[in-house]
UniProtKB/Swiss-Prot annotation:
The active site is at residue 140. PANTHER family: MAP/MICROTUBULE AFFINITY-REGULATING KINASE, NON-SPECIFIC SERINE_THREONINE PROTEIN KINASE. The keyword Nucleus applies. It is found in: Nucleus. One of its GO terms (cellular component) is nucleus. SMART domains: S_TKc. Its EC number is 2.7.11.1. This is Serine/threonine protein kinase OSK3. InterPro entries: KA1/Ssp2_C, KA1_dom, Kinase-like_dom_sf, Prot_kinase_dom, Protein_kinase_ATP_BS, Ser/Thr_kinase_AS, UBA. One of its GO terms (molecular function) is protein serine/threonine kinase activity. Coiled coil: none annotated. It comes from Oryza sativa subsp. japonica (Rice).
Amino acid sequence: MDGNAKGGGHSEALKNYNLGRTLGIGSFGKVKIAEHKLTGHRVAIKILNRRQMRNMEMEEKAKREIKILRLFIHPHIIRLYEVIYTPTDIYVVMEYCKFGELFDYIVEKGRLQEDEARRIFQQIISGVEYCHRNMVVHRDLKPENLLLDSKYNVKLADFGLSNVMHDGHFLKTSCGSPNYAAPEVISGKLYAGPEVDVWSCGVILYALLCGTLPFDDENIPNLFKKIKGGIYTLPSHLSALARDLIPRMLVVDPMKRITIREIREHQWFQIRLPRYLAVPPPDTAQQAKMIDEDTLQDVVNLGYGKDHVCESLRNRLQNEATVAYYLLLDNRFRATSGYLGADYQESLERNFNRFASSESASSNTRHYLPGSSDPHASGLRPHYPVERKWALGLQSRAQPREIMIEVLKALQDLNVSWKKNGQYNMKCRWSVGTQATDMLDVNNSFVDDSIIMDNGDVNGRLPAVIKFEIQLYKTRDEKYLLDMQRVTGPQLLFLDFCADFLTKLRVL
């Protein structure tokens, strides 16, 4: 390591680190290894040039990754320690992964033994599930974005293409690597999000077990054809359980694709499942409350005030004390158990119980988040919330085809014009006081997009118009959910229409 953060004008911004060699160079920055002076632990620092990012229109990508990683605390998601901003650069201080990309590991070793592939896959699914629980879909899962630490444990990285999911909102951006992208993504269709990551995980599992990709072709149109058709072969060396799981993940129809929950319950996945992966992690709010007493004392020994450290941790502040705390915490459990898993979780709870108890007896300062329940009353057991639903809408146990038939009947009765984007997705328009047949061909498709106004001006030449989208998708409890989202037009008018539409669908 360099004695100081020398070169390139980084010395003042990175005064707490000794910069080392360059790990990688990108189009708008580089990644360097560094040593945190206070703790002696290694980190990776992304150095992003602001001007180059602006020129390449990549600022949003960087902001998105920082926003997501600030939120996440998970053993199989790369840890963000701090972000340092200067007028010319952004320095993102992250967890250092000694053995680099999973991609290079697969290239070096070829296909993995099933037990090793399963261990890696279990960790990937754990990280992906955590993302989905926090309403984030990665959208670019591939071995190049999965890093290996010093114990060959997986860390999800590169959240630059990720989207934060909102209830009732479907993602439309086609992104990610074609070989790992789901059919609905490369087709440009709307998609809810979670099922896209499931497909990518299926491709990764295939690569782990086979050493090759299920969908590969130098000719991009041919590659897309294979992906859209789900055309691939399973090698004969795969076990029966693996041969059952992979095809269930690589289902072309996203509504029929296996879910993360079902993957976790699959017999192949359950074999030698580590204890810490058998239960969901606490949510991010609960994690912020947990303070490890031993690590806290280590930080206090470095010269920081106890109350200052606790206040910073519970409010998720970034400063020298919290950076030191998380570096010490991560390295303590990595060194003792090899996982930041059950031992990590149980130790945090145990130490926080002990810490909270002693503090309440000796001080009026309580080291847990304002508004949270008293730790003595709650026992400090982590609260595992019921999984949030991706959208609110009309749920039904009827078959998808039956649902769509009833939807089309209702739309026709209400004089709605529509255009199908896919088997379970359509764009719709509804005009007040105008017969929809005036604007439709015999297939209820739009004749001329330009003749419909979008501003809902009832005093204008044309009547008010509502544009909306309808999507049907599968929920985790084996139901189907019909979601409607307004695109343009008066909100109250749209609500009136929804009421009439739901009345028409009473048969469901």
